[in-house]
Amino acid sequence: MRRWRMEKFKIILSDPPIVKNQRQRSSFPSFGVLYLSAYIKKKVDNIEIYYLESFLTLDGHINRIRKIQPHVYGISFASFLKEKSLITIKKVREEFETLKIIAGGAHPTIFPGECLNIGADFCVLGEGEETFAELLNTIFLNKKDYRDIPGIAYKGSDGEIVITQKRKLIENLDTLPFPDWDLCQEKKYTGHSISKGKPQWSIIVSRGCPFNCNFCSNPIWKHNIPWLRLRSPENIAEEVKLIYSKGYREIDLICDEFNPNLKWAKDVCQAIKNLRLRDIFFRTLLRAAPIDEELCSLLNDINCWSVNLGIESANKRVLKGINKSITIDEVTRCLTYLKKYKIRTFGFFMMFNAWEKNGQPQFETLEEVNNTLSFAESLLKKKLLRNISWGFVSPIPGSDLYNTLIKHKLIHK
């Protein structure tokens, strides 16, 4: 695109302000925002991008906007931050009447009307990079017709909400630039409380999930195929090398699960191993299946010392009901491999699951919950798990569980 204007347009990308005082800190920045910023800088000319991080108070957030005086303000959030985020949008609209407000992320994708009715001008639905960049170019050209931009919601001239056609998912993640390192205040993030290497950073290695657990909100992204997109092992290794050169010594490989494709997971490990970086550590998230001893050996080779494993339940009926697509035998086999290679495993369990069968709601019994807790305790005693976490299942908007409970009037929207 040719450079058609002299004035630089200022854009704010923000996390919801979630702290009560400025002394609080977050573990990591929003890597989605950093990837988005890098893409926008590649596709939109003559701009300045600012990042308002989550460790600001609401007043601090507003003061930063007032100081920057942006042309566009973007905020991204999931449903568990809905309340703080909607309050923020409302406050920003009240303080800055002419500012263009764009909401993105999981919650605006599911409930764009909530955001538009409280003050947002647009919602970006689904993946943000291509849509946000196209919307910015349209805004900066002062065009008033947004109907041809896929993947947005806005209010038309009659006040009715307009939702444009869905945008295709980005198939080749290698085409996306690496995160915008200059955007965030790296030293203000605490990282994980337990680690083997410091400082810490993260890489998003894939997008999407081929599985369909009923408690997950992943269906909101599955409006198109391919659902699962994997960065090439070479591309991941290149970013690892860059992060290492900046002094980081532990990397979290972020994904829904690292092993949806066993060959790819092994190839990623091998590509990292070929870098011969001896003093760096990794952590990631696995499924109990598919897995084999070779993958666990390769994880050990690259100093992957910690993995999270979603087990959820010890009951066959429940695992089938929530569509987890694993068995207890697979869980035990996976943990046995990980223990052999001295990889610390954190197991996650959910209590009082629910699902639908033959048109009727089904519920996990107290006996089944106790069986799961007993199973978790046995895994700790055998040192197959190092830590466990459990909690009540929560119906996340966009999940099949949420839709089932709404359908049977067991919760309200």
Each language-model region and where it sits:
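Glycine-rich beta-alpha loop elements in corrinoid/cobalamin-binding modules
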Residues: 9-10, 39-169, 398
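Glycine- and acidic-residue-enriched helix-capping/strand-helix junction motifs
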Residues: 20-33
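Radical SAM [4Fe-4S] cluster-binding motif and immediate context
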Residues: 28, 174, 179-345, 353-355, ...
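A general structural detector for well-ordered alpha-helical segments in enzyme core domains, enriched
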Residues: 36, 61-64, 84, 88-92, ...
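Catalytic cores of alpha/beta
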Residues: 112-117, 294-295, 356-378
